[in-house]
């Protein structure tokens, strides 16, 4: 870390200004009744950039060039084109467009003005790459804030996964983490390109109030950290200062006494525009369709950016989230089969206190552009999450009376800590006829988990002088609540912990994109070296491990035409795994390999995109919960996943934005310590996943600003949470949602109704010890939101 800081300080002292290879700005209307209003759907091009950028609904754009960008041309239907000169790396540009009276048609102006940006042409700077999405030898899908708003989602757990092929959730709790699965494995989570994933559950799901976009990376990503499942990862890009004044407020209300207020403020703090800020805040409270459940949340997220020089910028951000909720998890269980209980059934009791969570995270970033070809980025981040609470649990069927659940309270006190550092350089140079785009850097990460976990505190003495658990019976056929369950707090806090785990890793990597034949063919070799150490102490059993691993990568991408490319990818990864076996054996990392080919196409100047990928993934060193004691782990064997991903997203015709995706996945166990599981489906297996979302803005001659939405989620061939030799029948999943919206230059209103058909839906099913477990999903419910931008 000392070397990273020293390098960053050195960069701050380097000489004259440099031109920009990345230009950011906002496009606004300059005259008329909507003067100053942002213009979404404007195209921004440059002779120095191979791709065209499109402004989002707030008018913002980002354009990346292979050389320094000196000229921009902005076009928008119904407005006079504007060409501007770019000099130096100053604050974000503001470009004004004037309506073209000779060509403007009322309908065309309004329809284009209210364009929703469902697609994007470039990855965020957090992914470290400077190659347009179309030219990358990897399948990356982005979910924009317009999509999230139209679907009424308030955080990562509420349907964001429906917008990317094959992504499903383990829904054991919407408060503990996103738990996203894809291509036969749980995908890693990143925030602004930084690994802040705790050892245990988490991270806490990011709130929509701070999300700028969510990027799903299919397959391993050596350019990020290669520490994660070979299925891929997702990266949450948080809102940053834009340099232009921005003030917005959003109010939502809905079913189950749902209320939410959010504010988004930003702009310059100094006349020069060098010091900028962004402040997001949110407060929410809601009850639930499940008895005795509730959720209260508070979020504050300030960001400061300082343009130290024309070439050097510093950004500091902080996130604070406080949660209080009724149920640790809405899981229910019965011996009578999946979905056999009422939707509002719970095993909890009102006498139990709430679960409380306090989550702190921060990040500091320094970027420095040496010249038009070379840029250095350094970043440090931390996360501290504290959670405490009690809950009731049932571990096995009651043989005396299966319909009576024997509930016993458990107590958890968890603290997860992550510290992450990274530094990387992007550079461009040529060797003869070859053009190189180099990415090289270093990552360091320290994770720690302390817990008094699964504490069985409610016991009674036995005649033999021992203790036994105290049970609170609950008849699933005629539940009667009101038991007084005693609360509990660890008397010495984490000093009385039964779990302490650490993972530390350090990594060096280099990736070189070599362009041939006037950038038609791109070959991307890379390699990453990772050293990882783990230490574990679980209920008195200690273990440790140390591994040094080199993971190579090779990508190929060929541009058949300016809007069509094909690619191939070979990449390997590893996952450091914490935990202890009951015998204290060392746990080795999970290792994975991905082989993939695909084709990508941009349509209508990038207004909508399509991607098709075929993959084959192998994994070894898979970790599972010890069936004899949930505090311990076992390494079980190997599996593979193969399948097809299809993604279509964007504005296919004027006014109609779509998100359509399909995934076929075939994932099986190849070897296991339990021979009966060989050939069985992997955990949370789903054979077919198909999602569709349509949003249509009516032509202005009918009703100005009115739009309608309709979408569904469909899953067929679903497996269970744990691998089993004989699957229990799990019903298919189909949910239909619809909505209506209206917007003007400053006001947006959206009404969304989920589960229109009021289907009885279940998620994350499994069978163990004679009981069927699952998480019920809400019936028909609605949300109304209103957002005003000043």
Predicted regions and their residues:
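Short acidic/polar hinge/loop motifs at secondary-structure boundaries
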Residues: 62-64, 168-170, 179, 194-218, ...
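Outer-membrane beta-barrel translocator/receptor signature
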Residues: 210-212, 223-302, 308-312, 608
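Membrane-embedded beta-barrel scaffold of Gram-negative outer-membrane proteins
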Residues: 368-381, 385-391, 591-651, 657-670
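Gram-negative outer-membrane beta-barrel transporters
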Residues: 635-723, 785-789
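C-terminal beta-signal and adjacent terminal beta-strands/loops
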Residues: 658, 713-721, 742-790
């Amino acid at each position: 870390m000392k070397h990273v800081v020293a390098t960053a300080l050195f960069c701050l002292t380097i000489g004259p200004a440099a031109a920009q290879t990345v230009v950011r700005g906002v496009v606004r209307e300059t005259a008329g009744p909507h003067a100053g209003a942002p213009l979404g759907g404007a195209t921004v091009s440059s002779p120095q950039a191979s791709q065209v950028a499109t402004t989002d609904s707030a008018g913002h754009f980002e354009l990346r060039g292979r050389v320094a960008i000196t000229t921009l041309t902005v076009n928008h239907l119904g407005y006079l084109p504007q060409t501007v000169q770019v000099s130096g790396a100053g604050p974000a540009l503001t470009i004004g467009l004037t309506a073209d009276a000779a060509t403007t048609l009322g309908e065309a102006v309004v329809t284009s003005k209210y364009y929703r940006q469902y697609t994007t042409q470039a990855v965020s700077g957090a992914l470290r790459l400077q190659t347009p999405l179309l030219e990358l030898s990897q399948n990356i899908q982005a979910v924009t804030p317009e999509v999230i708003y139209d679907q009424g989602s308030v955080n990562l757990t509420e349907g964001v996964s429906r917008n990317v092929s094959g992504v499903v959730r383990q829904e054991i709790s919407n408060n503990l983490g996103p738990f996203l699965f894809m291509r036969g494995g749980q995908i890693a989570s990143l925030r602004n390109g930084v690994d802040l994933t705790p050892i245990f559950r988490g991270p806490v799901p990011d709130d929509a109030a701070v999300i700028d976009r969510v990027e799903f990376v299919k397959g391993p990503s050596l350019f990020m950290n290669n520490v994660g499942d070979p299925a891929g990862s997702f990266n949450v890009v948080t809102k940053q200062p834009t340099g232009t004044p921005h003030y917005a407020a959003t109010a939502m209300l809905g079913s189950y006494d749902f209320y939410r207020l959010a504010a988004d403020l930003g702009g310059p703090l100094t006349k020069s525009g060098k010091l900028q800020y962004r402040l997001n805040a949110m407060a929410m409270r809601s009850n639930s369709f499940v008895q005795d459940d509730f959720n209260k949340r508070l979020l504050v997220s300030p960001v400061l950016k300082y343009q130290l020089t024309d070439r050097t910028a510093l950004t500091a951000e902080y996130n604070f989230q406080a949660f209080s909720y009724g149920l640790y998890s809405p899981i229910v269980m019965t011996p009578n089969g999946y979905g056999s209980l009422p939707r509002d059934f719970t095993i909890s009791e009102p006498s139990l206190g709430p679960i409380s969570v306090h989550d702190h995270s921060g990040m500091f970033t320094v970027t420095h552009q040496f010249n038009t070809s070379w840029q250095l980025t350094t970043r440090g981040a931390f996360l501290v999450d504290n959670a405490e609470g009690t809950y009731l649990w049932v571990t096995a069927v009651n043989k005396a009376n299966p319909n009576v659940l024997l509930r016993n309270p458990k107590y958890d006190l968890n603290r997860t800590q992550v510290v992450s550092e990274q530094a990387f350089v992007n550079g461009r140079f040529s060797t003869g006829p070859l053009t190189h785009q180099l990415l090289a850097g270093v990552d360091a990460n320290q994770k720690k988990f302390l817990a008094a976990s699964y504490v069985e505190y409610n016991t009674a003495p036995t005649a033999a002088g021992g203790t036994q658990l105290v049970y609170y019976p609950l008849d699933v056929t005629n539940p009667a609540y009101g038991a007084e369950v005693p609360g509990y707090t660890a008397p010495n806090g984490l000093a009385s912990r039964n779990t302490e785990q650490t993972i530390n890793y350090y990594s060096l990597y280099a990736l070189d994109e070599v362009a041939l034949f006037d950038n038609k063919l791109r070959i991307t070799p890379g390699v990453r070296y990772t050293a990882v150490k783990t230490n574990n102490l679980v209920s008195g059993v200690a273990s440790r491990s140390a591994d040094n691993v080199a993971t190579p990568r090779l990508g190929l991408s060929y541009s058949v035409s300016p809007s069509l490319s094909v690619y191939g990818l070979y990449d390997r990864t590893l996952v450091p795994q914490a935990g202890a076996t009951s015998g204290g054996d060392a746990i080795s990392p999970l290792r994975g390999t991905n082989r993939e080919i695909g084709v990508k196409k941009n349509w209508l100047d990038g207004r909508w995109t399509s991607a098709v990928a075929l993959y084959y993934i192998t994994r070894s060193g898979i970790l599972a919960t010890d069936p004899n004691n949930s505090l311990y782990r076992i390494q079980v064997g190997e599996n593979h996943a193969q399948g097809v991903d299809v993604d279509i997203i964007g504005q296919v015709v004027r006014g109609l934005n779509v998100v359509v995706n399909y995934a076929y996945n075939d994932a099986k166990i190849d070897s296991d310590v339990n021979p009966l599981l060989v050939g069985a489906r992997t955990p949370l297996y789903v054979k077919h996943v198909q999602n569709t979302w349509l949003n249509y803005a009516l032509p202005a001659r009918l009703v100005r600003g009115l739009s309608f939405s309709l979408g569904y989620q469909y899953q067929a061939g679903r497996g269970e949470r744990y691998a089993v030799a004989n699957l229990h029948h799990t019903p298919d999943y189909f949910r239909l949602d619809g909505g209506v919206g209206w917007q003007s230059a400053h006001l947006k209103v959206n009404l969304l109704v989920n589960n229109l058909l009021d289907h009885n839906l279940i998620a994350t099913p499994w069978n163990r010890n004679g009981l069927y477990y699952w998480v019920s999903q809400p019936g028909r419910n609605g949300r109304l939101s209103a957002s005003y931008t000043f």
